C-alpha cells in the first residue's frame, strides 16, 4: 500500500486532538447573550495565514452561538494526520484537491462560521462556492504583522523557506486580489483585541444583505 493510500485509510477512524472543538458550537458558561442575524447564511473567513481566521472565527461563533469549523482541522480529521504531513506525502497539489473537496461540502452547511485556509481561494471553483453560498469576510493584515504572528509556527509548510518574510510577501501579492474578489466585507485585524474586533463585526453582519 502506498503512502497516499495510508493517508486515506486513516481518515475515518483517527481524528486529531481538537477536532471535537472545531466541529461543535462554541459556547461557554457566562457568555454574553447571543447576537442574532436576520438570516442563516454561513459566514466564511478568508485571508492570509496568521490573519486571525481561527481566533476571530471562534469569537464570532461564540457571539452568534453558531458552529465553528476550521477547514484545516476538518482536513486533519478526515485524513488522520496533520497538514504538514499531507503536504509531505501528496505535495501541495494533493493537499489542494483535498481542501477543495472539504470546502465544497462545508460551504453547503447553514449557520456556520468557516475559517478557510490561506490558499483556499486559489481554485476558481472554491471562490465560486464562497461567493455564492454565504457571507465572505476578508481578514486583512500587513506582511509585517503576519510575519510576527507566524514566525514561531512550525506547522506552516509554505513558510518552510530561507526567507519566510519574503515568502509571505510573494503569497500576499498573488492572493490579495483573490481575497478581494470574493469578499463581501473587508476587516483590518491589526493589533485590535479579538473581543473588540468581534463586537465591531456584529453590526456589520446584522446590516449586511447578500446580493
From Swiss-Prot:
Amino-acid positions noted as binding ATP in the UniProt annotation, renumbered to this chain: 50-55, 156
Segments for region (Disordered): 1-23
Principal location listed in the UniProt entry: cytoplasm
InterPro entries associated with the record: P-loop_NTPase, Shikimate/glucono_kinase, Shikimate_kinase/TSH1, Shikimate_kinase_CS
Pfam family of the protein (one): SKI
Cofactor, free-text remark: Binds 1 Mg(2+) ion per subunit.
Binding sites annotated in the UniProt record for substrate: 72, 96, 118, 175
Family: Belongs to the shikimate kinase family.
Name recorded for this polypeptide: Shikimate kinase
Organism, as annotated: Bordetella bronchiseptica (strain ATCC BAA-588 / NCTC 13252 / RB50) (Alcaligenes bronchisepticus)
Protein encoded by which gene: aroK
Amino acid at each position: 500500500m502506498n503512502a497516499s493510500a495510508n493517508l486515506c485509510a486513516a481518515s475515518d477512524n483517527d481524528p486529531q486532538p481538537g477536532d471535537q472543538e472545531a466541529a461543535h458550537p462554541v459556547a461557554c458558561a457566562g457568555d454574553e447573550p447571543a447576537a442574532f442575524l436576520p438570516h442563516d447564511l454561513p459566514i466564511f473567513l478568508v485571508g492570509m495565514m496568521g490573519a486571525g481566521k481561527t481566533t476571530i472565527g471562534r469569537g464570532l461563533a461564540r457571539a452568534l452561538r453558531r458552529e465553528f469549523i476550521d477547514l484545516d482541522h476538518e482536513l486533519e480529521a478526515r485524513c488522520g494526520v496533520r497538514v504538514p504531513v499531507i503536504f509531505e506525502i501528496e505535495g501541495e497539489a494533493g493537499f489542494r484537491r483535498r481542501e477543495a473537496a472539504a470546502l465544497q461540502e462545508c460551504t453547503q452547511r447553514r449557520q456556520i462560521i468557516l475559517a478557510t485556509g490561506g490558499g483556499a481561494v486559489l481554485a476558481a471553483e472554491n471562490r465560486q462556492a464562497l461567493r455564492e453560498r454565504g457571507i465572505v469576510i476578508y481578514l486583512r493584515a500587513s506582511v509585517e504583522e503576519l510575519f510576527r504572528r507566524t514566525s514561531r509556527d512550525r506547522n506552516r509548510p509554505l513558510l518552510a523557506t530561507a526567507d519566510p518574510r519574503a515568502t509571505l510577501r510573494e503569497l500576499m501579492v498573488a492572493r490579495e486580489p483573490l481575497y478581494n474578489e470574493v469578499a463581501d466585507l473587508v476587516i483590518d485585524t491589526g493589533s485590535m483585541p479579538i473581543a473588540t474586533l468581534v463586537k465591531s463585526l456584529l453590526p456589520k453582519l446584522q446590516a449586511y444583505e447578500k446580493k
